[in-house]
Amino acid sequence: MAGTKKRANADDDFVLTLSDDENDTLNQLEEEGEGDDGALATGSKTKKRKRDDAAAAQQEKGKNKKVKKQEQQQQQAQQKKKKGKNAPVQEEEDEDEEEEEDQGEDDGALNSDFEFDVGGAANEVRDFDGWEVNGNEEGKGGDKKAVDIDDIISRRQAKKEAELIRKQKKKKQKQEEEFSELEDDDEEDGGMEVDFGDDELLAEDGFGMGVDGEEESEKSDAEDEEKEEGSDEEAEGSDEDEQMDEDDDDAASDDDSVATPVMHPDDIASDRDSDEESQVDAEEEEKRKAFFAPEEEKTSESAMADAKRSFQEFNLSRPILRGLAGVNFSNPTPIQRKTIPVALLGKDIVGSAVTGSGKTAAFVVPILERLLFRPRKVPTSRVAILMPTRELAVQCYNVATKLATYTDITFCQLVGGFSLREQENILKKRPDVIIATPGRFIDHMRNSASFTVDTLEILVLDEADRMLEDGFADELNEILTTIPKSRQTMLFSATMTDTVDKLIRVGLNRPVRLMVDAKKNTAVTLVQEFVRLRPGREDKRLGYLLYLCKEIYTGRVIVFFRQKKEAHRVRIIFGLLGLKAAELHGSMSQEQSVENFREGKAAFLLATDLASRGLDIKGVETVINYEAPQSHEIYLHRVGRTARAGRSGRACTIAAEPDRKVVKAAVKAGKSQGAKIASRVIEPAVADSWAAKAEELADEVEEVLSEEKLEKQLAQAEMQVTKGENLIKHEAEIKSRPKRTWFETERDKKAARKLGAAELNGPDAGMSKKEKQKLSNKDKKRLDDSRQRQEAGAGWKKGRATRESMKNGQLPKAKKDNKKKGKK
């Protein structure tokens, strides 16, 4: 029994740690179970090894103590020299502390090196950003490398500098050679006699010197006096002319009647449109009453109580509250206060609030709360969140994963630019929430065997008014007809439509309408500025932009363009002028687009309307509209990239005559809201100078574009080579894959793309150059002639022979033949 107790005590003393060899320990434990004799033998071996380890540790400890004592003695010796008598007392105290350490007494106090970690919430508050990409997600974008404009510009500038230095060296060498030749000539001429026969060698005060000079000076003095008299007469004459002009103006103003102001045709059209919008059809109003759920009437007391509510009062689970605290969300915004209780009840919602008011959290929080109570036996995808752009989907994915940090809810993002195979592998695990763009969602829905939509219970459409436009109509209909009809549907946007005919398509069931702010409102903290371009100065628009970016708004600026081609050209000009800029449009991937701007490496983000919706890029101070957008709704989304979540911001729009309608709508909405609106005046001469600088760089821009095109072609060729190698190497596997299908033909996709472009940039945006160009008079006449022939019923056109024969008074050849046949 005694031996068994000793062995038990020895086993209790032995503690498994991460540094121990687990395999050896497991083998020893297995050997212990073989028999009593084997167990005793193993126990003795273990004791022996432990004693050896303990002795080695004690020796090491003793060595460390000796080293420490030696160091302390040296320090104390130095202190004795400085302090004198106080040193021995300190030495005794140190020795007492060492004895206590040797005894190994534990007084229950925490080690000073111990750090308490609250689970990462504090760290996440500091570093939270909607654009943050986790380490695991960084490699999902593929190995595609884009052409770097900055590299091309820096290479070209380095070449130019080297060439300039070489030219300067050559010039210097030439000058030195010329100088040396001149010196040689001077040396050769040094021995020659100089003839001063024709020169005046008298002193200046000598007789006859300076006579010509005095005559010339007298003449110049006389001329100056005449000029002064003439200028005085001119001044008097100009004063008289001015007085005469003023008298004429007064007489004219008395005789002529005052002209009445005439409205601009665009103003008349915009007023008519606004009147039509304000007068809501009675039939439409009846439709809305029947379609939407009745709204609850709230008293002022209940409104005050709602304003004071916090997230704790929604009875949310502790993991959700902890996630909200982790991203520093303490009090809900108005849209969150209204949405969360209704969404938790499972009702359909149509929500609208100004940009930057927290709409993403308004639908993510109730979804997470409902998913905490899901059955966990079988993994199932229950939620689909659809976004119009991949950048917005990536941002929503990052926000949702941050809020769900302390839960077991899984997410998947299905967006373009990421590997299809990796997305399919994640879908096999049936994630709870799928955040996707419509195109990639349909692709997986049709072609991924592991993805099923039969179990979806919640559908969210963010930026729903954009999703309901013609460009997304076909894709949205395909999704809505495939997923279950018995679902909860939530629609959110800053400019949410309430047209019943559009909302019926989504399959809403008596939705609750949650309109927090008045329609077409901006944030209160936003200052709106407008720079007016006079007629005939539209070609100087780039000069105004360069002045604004170089002199006034120099950091954290988003510049919006209508077309990515123009954005790319301005990006090159910015690079040549030394302005650090990044691009964000459909041809760029998300990593290329925002990473430099988010990290502060680029001061300007040149974007199209792709980035105007929903994107929450941290610290944006200013938004500049290079051109006013197609509609007031797009303008609201653009300027909503700044002044978010209560922060201040500024929006500046460069507006010409064609932009009058949008500018007037923005000013009218801002004044009704009480927002600050200002007009910025830029001197035309300053703008012209910057425009001239941009024109000087036109050739350089073309060369950079051609070099970029060449690099893209090389990259494309390399990709084709790699593709060919893979086809040869993995031929069997590639041929065994089923062909990916789509619900539309290429013609239908092209038509949908045109409709989407027309929604953003007007009817002319989707047209080709041939369709856009103006018809010549010759073409117009040809079209008129063809129309007249069709109206007259004559389907043929007189040929050259017919016209010539009619001029000569002869019948056409065919008619002659017919006449001869008739005579016979």
Swiss-Prot record:
Locus of motif Q motif: 309-337
Domain Helicase C-terminal: 541-685
Basic and acidic residues bias locations: 137-166, 285-305, 739-749, 767-790
Pfam families for the chain: DEAD (PF00270), Helicase_C (PF00271)
Gene3D superfamilies found in the cross-reference section: P-loop containing nucleotide triphosphate hydrolases (3.40.50.300)
EC number: 3.6.4.13
Disordered as annotated region, ranges: 1-305, 739-824
BP term (GO), one: ribosomal large subunit assembly
Gene Ontology cellular-component annotations: cytosol; nucleolus; preribosome, large subunit precursor
Entry's Gene Ontology molecular function annotations: ATP binding; ATP hydrolysis activity; RNA binding; RNA helicase activity
Domain of life assignment: Eukaryota
Annotated binding of ATP, by residue: A353, V354, T355, G356, S357, G358, K359, T360
Matches recorded under CDD domains: DEADc_DDX27, SF2_C_DEAD
Main location (coarse class): nucleus
Motif (DEAD box): 462-465
Reactions catalysed: ATP + H2O = ADP + phosphate + H(+)
Protein task: ATP-binding RNA helicase involved in ribosome assembly.
Subunit relationships: Associates with pre-ribosomal particles.
Family: Belongs to the DEAD box helicase family. DDX27/DRS1 subfamily.
Protein's UniProt name: ATP-dependent RNA helicase drs1
Source organism: Aspergillus niger (strain ATCC MYA-4892 / CBS 513.88 / FGSC A1513)
